[in-house]
Amino acid sequence: MPSSEASPAAGLSEDSTRHLPRILCLHGGGTNARIFKAQCRQLSAQLKRDFRFIYAEAPWISIAGPDVLAVYGQWGPFKRWLRWSPEQPDITTQETVKELDQCLARAVEADNACGTTGEVVAILGFSQGAKVAASVLYWQQRSGQSLGLRASNSGYRFGVLLAGSSPLVDLSTCEGDSNGLSENAWPGDDMIGPRALDCDTHKLIIPTLHVHGLQDRGLRLHRALMEDFCAPESTTLIEWDGVHRVPLNRAEVSRVAGQIRKLAGLTSNS
């Protein structure tokens, strides 16, 4: 079993990271916050002097995601943000938005209780978490509301989307303004259906970094999220020779970390 409890900011005390800007992290479907913290260990280590990472836990119990049991089989319970199997019960848009907001807020508030003062400046997600992260950014762009953040925070300035699939999901809770959540939550599934947002009229302009594994079976859908739903002038792409996982190789992680620093600088309020 891999070691999980080592701090992602090894070499720095907790006190020394409390002032840093924060990145809110959303795990993939069929995993959980503890697993995602382990999966992000190299990235958080390379950014330990720049950002404090906080990890949100999805609201609904799930079966384990693809390839999760082989490494993290004893790390349950596993959670999901959206339906990713036809056997899972459907959830109303209103219920999903409420639970999503509460889960993100809980993670931020728990970190606030540690005495942190840094603003939450970005949202990062992997797989289903990236799909949700992009949708949260779009909802902020459309409504001016930042799910999970309260009045003291000015909103997410950028997003980091690791292997996120098309399409965006509609988080609008206004009856008549939404057909509900996207039904395209299954990895590699082409089903779009009436609940998906139309890429011709919905473009995310908040800056996003997209990280795509060239051996990932879902690569076509990952490219579609970037090309069809994100404005080209606000996107940055990193491709790496990997499958559907968070990069761990030092050189690849260094590229991602460098672009995150760059985005943070470009979107800084100072």
UniProtKB/Swiss-Prot annotation:
It holds the Pfam family FSH1. Pathway: Mycotoxin biosynthesis. The active site is at 127 (charge relay system), 216 (charge relay system), 244 (charge relay system). Coiled coil: none annotated. Keywords: Hydrolase, Virulence. One of its GO terms (biological process) is secondary metabolite biosynthetic process. This is Esterase.
